[in-house]
Amino acid sequence: MTRVALVKTRERITGVNRALDLLDLPSFGGKTLFLKPNYNSADPPPGSTHNDVLVALVRRLRELGVGPITVGDRSGMGDTRQVMQRKGIFHLAEELDFETIVFDELEAEGWQRMHVPGSHWRKGFAVAQPVLDAGAVVQTCCLKTHRLGGHFTLSLKNSVGLVAKQVPGDGYDYMSELHTSPHQRSMIAEVNVAYQP
């Protein structure tokens, strides 16, 4: 059974900690952790993950016994490195001792092609290998609708940032396929079978 915690507060750090208390997560036992924020753009929340949320998660997950933490993303609306720079993520990485990955900068071997039976993706889709290699994955979704598709998808759409726009050496544009498909909502959901949160 999946547990869900809802916390209403104006204090993000308090809210993150309270939600994690309610979830009563077991110790991570030193597992590596991939933390997927929403840095589709550097827009203020709810357009992107608030830095207080990221800081609270990193600190609290360390208390719960996670090993090395990596934070990474692929922006859909701009240059990912510039988005993360504008958000101050590289500074936070130094301050809080976590690694960062800009998915746009991964070489071809940094992507794993996924073929989901019955999927609407014509050629499958490519997921960032560091996500698949992590012992645990945590996402920080933004509660917003989406310009392309216009539906409220929570963390399902956030997983699209784990998928390559293009894999180096392969000219196929996965995001063009997704954003022009009449099956866009199904394709977004299908991306989420690639990993276990």
Briefly describe each language-model feature range.
Residues M1-P197:
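N-terminal and secondary-structure boundary signal
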